[in-house]
């Protein structure tokens, strides 16, 4: 922490090489069971897990093309349960971007974007870009899931609500997806890579500008 008690800025991630294949580290966070692991598995392995098994910490690797650049994505899954609150920050070091996820059929997971995940990410990843993801959009049309939700006098989280949360946490983008039906899954990671690369370029320009001022 600095003298005022605010958390010190996170260490700057290592810059991706100037030519050839770029490499990015992306950490994904959100409540347990919100769809993080399914999203990562479908994108990186092409398989949707039929049974829920809580993750602790897992790493997935995938490639994406952004413009003419080949980008390697090192994707870090994290545990959303409170039991891992003290271990999870170990995943944040040298991160280029954080995906904050919630389940559109679970209002509590949506509320926790602002209550838990935004404060945690900004504390440990100060200055690192975020993208907000609404998961499990296919369940908005699932009659049984809707019945259960409405029995508790609740409604699915709408796209407009997701966009509002995105603005409140100052995330770079809000996207929705269904891992089960592979809807927008590739878009999530392609757009995340674009945001991370743009932030890297901006940081490099600022560093060069500071060097010029010193000279």
Swiss-Prot record:
One of its GO terms (biological process) is regulation of actin cytoskeleton organization. The modification N-acetylmethionine is found at residue 1. GO terms for molecular function: GTP binding; GTPase activity; protein kinase binding. Residues 213-215 form a propeptide. It is found in: Cell membrane; Cytoplasm, Cytoskeleton. Signal peptide: none annotated. It holds the Pfam family Ras. SUPFAM superfamilies: P-loop containing nucleoside triphosphate hydrolases. Keywords: Acetylation, Cell membrane, Cytoplasm, Cytoskeleton, GTP-binding, Lipoprotein, Membrane, Methylation, Nucleotide-binding, Prenylation. GTP binds at residues 30-37, 77-81, 135-138. The modification Cysteine methyl ester is found at residue 212. A motif (Effector region) lies at residues 52-60. This is Rho-related GTP-binding protein RhoF. It comes from Bos taurus (Bovine).
